[in-house]
């Protein structure tokens, strides 16, 4: 009767043990990875939180979100805190001389989004005061935003965090209203920006509609209407809040009537986060 030599048995057993060990290590590594959604917050001064107040911002729901600080600490994640993006000034997105970031809508957005989806968010700051869409397309703003987004992905990978979904939130329009950007120009430029961000991995753009100018209600209307039309015509644009259009109480703005105070930012963020989360909950599997 033929028998397998003892040394071959040993080799066979060792090989089997190695295979089991590799499987076990792989399973362990899979279990230690977490999944989070990556969201980049883009726009101008009201996205930056120029009229906010950290002391009036909501507390973060435990486990709901983190901030990736591309400029000040690019090698790790921080628990989300206000003022969001406080010192994230660099290159084309450096607006240090224009405004101070005092408190944003981002924490309220993330809390509401997390309540809907149960998925934590890694938030990236990428806004600049007084920025028009043409500026985003021609002055290096979109490239700086892309660099920050891609750096966040690298950091998340290093931290063993799987990027489940990638989105952008857009809150902008005052600059284009001042420039008298036409309806067609605004829609075309916004579509170009979103298309560029999609090339960076963004799945959808969540849009917060611009609010009215309290001193001249007609001034912002063309851009406000263009934003609504763009969301109807472009499947990559998802309207998540029209609340700014309803917040016409002067007490909700700063003394210039331009920047929303923290009370308004909390309301806008919560509304947008809830609606964005509901969208992701329903359509999130449709990558």
Describe each region flagged by the PLM.
Residues 18-35:
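Bacterial Sec-dependent signal peptides at the C-terminal "C-region" and cleavage site
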């Amino acid at each position: 009767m033929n028998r397998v030599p003892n040394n071959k048995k040993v080799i066979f057993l060792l090989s089997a043990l190695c295979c089991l060990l590799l499987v076990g290590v792989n399973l362990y590594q899979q279990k230690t990875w977490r999944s989070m959604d990556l969201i980049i917050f883009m726009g101008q001064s009201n996205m930056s939180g120029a009229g906010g107040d950290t002391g009036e911002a909501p507390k973060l729901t435990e486990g709901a979100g983190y901030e990736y600080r591309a400029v000040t600490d690019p090698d790790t994640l921080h628990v989300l805190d206000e003022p969001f993006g406080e010192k994230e000034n660099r290159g084309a997105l450096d607006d240090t001389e224009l405004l101070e970031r005092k408190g944003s809508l981002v924490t309220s957005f993330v809390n509401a989004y997390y309540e809907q989806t149960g998925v934590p968010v890694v938030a990236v700051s990428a806004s600049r005061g007084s920025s028009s869409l043409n500026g985003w397309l021609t002055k290096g703003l979109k490239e700086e935003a892309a660099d920050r987004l891609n750096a966040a992905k690298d950091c998340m990978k290093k931290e063993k965090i799987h990027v489940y979904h990638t989105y952008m939130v857009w809150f902008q329009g005052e600059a284009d209203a001042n420039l008298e950007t036409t309806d067609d120009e605004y829609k075309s430029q916004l579509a170009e920006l979103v298309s560029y961000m999609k090339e960076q991995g963004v799945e959808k753009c969540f849009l917060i509609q611009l609010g009215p100018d309290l001193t001249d209600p007609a001034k912002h209307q063309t851009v406000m209407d263009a934003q609504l039309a763009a969301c109807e015509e472009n499947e990559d644009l998802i309207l998540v809040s029209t609340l700014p259009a309803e917040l016409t109480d002067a007490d909700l703005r700063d003394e210039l009537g331009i920047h929303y105070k923290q009370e308004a930012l909390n309301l806008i963020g919560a509304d947008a986060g809830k609606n964005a989360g509901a969208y992701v909950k329903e359509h999130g599997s449709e990558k």
